Amino acid sequence: MTLSAETIDLALQGKGLNWLEVDGFRQALETLPSKEGVQIFADACDVNAQRFTQRILADLPQWPWPESRMTSEHKADTRYPVVAMASILAKEERDRSIAAMAARVGFNVGSGYPSDPNTKAALRDLILQSGIDADVRWGWATVERFWSAQRQGDVPVRGQQRT
């Protein structure tokens, strides 16, 4: 499952990233072919790991599943190899998305992290050339800083027309 920059921006305008992750976990669990004997391990994004579990399971159809349990912990990737593997796969998918964006725009966009000088340069170039790219989180503080320095008016907000 991947989430677009637009999905993340819209979540930040609504319930927030924690709820986006809760919904994402729930959707992923709903796709499991078997709902019996499932051991679920999650890296909790909520400050309260148990609440994270409860929110995911609250609307999960037919939960509790037979002989199944869910464990959410902070830094679960350091304790459960399956969570560490999922984290690596997610980072690889993110890297592929960044590479695809670079190929589409025709220049190096860096790693996508705000501390990366190549990412900062790419954001400046994108904002100067065409505004904010669809694959960039518009609500990102780094984007807001560059927009304020190089453009007139407020940073565009997803889902809202500029006047």
Q: Where are the regions a protein language model picked out?
A:
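RNase H-like, two-metal
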Residues: 1-163
